[in-house]
């Protein structure tokens, strides 16, 4: 498998077709299941879905309606980007994208018809000075504290277009991948030293908004459900513990 999770209300309406996989397993049999197991040690199953994340992002836009928002997420999370665009349209905000992988993935998603761009929402990053702070949102790479990513350059004051100011609100719509914690903390520290407010998933109780990230990997109960349905002769966990 690749990365997977069970989603009751996916943004694109395409659910994990476990019924079809079960049919194949019953008819042909599964000799070996090589399953990505990144979150297999996390108890239970997901208690919220991507629509909940979108709702939380909308809450942030409403709560900080006079502030410039900078949202960092994984560039491969097309559904997350779709949610940000939808909420930005609702809030009357313009959206710019920054980061090579972010722009590349967005272009591929557009060509594949995997994302819908609301009319008159996307602008160029260099045009941010044309809009009031409360009407501008930047979506960028760097949620893992990568040294050369857009967000880290902002945190160090080295970005040529965006200089962090004390009215900015930076949102991490992500979790730190194990091993990246110190890099994320370094970026957060830099952003706060530059003067911005930082909102991180898992710490949203400090701001009153809901969850800002949903893992793309199944939890323990999800793995049990998949293995039980496919009933392979052999099982090999990969890409995890």
Residue positions per predicted region:
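C-terminal regulatory/interaction regions
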Residues: 85-86, 90, 109-241
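His/Asp/Glu-rich metal-coordinating catalytic cores
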Residues: 1-130, 149-163, 182-184
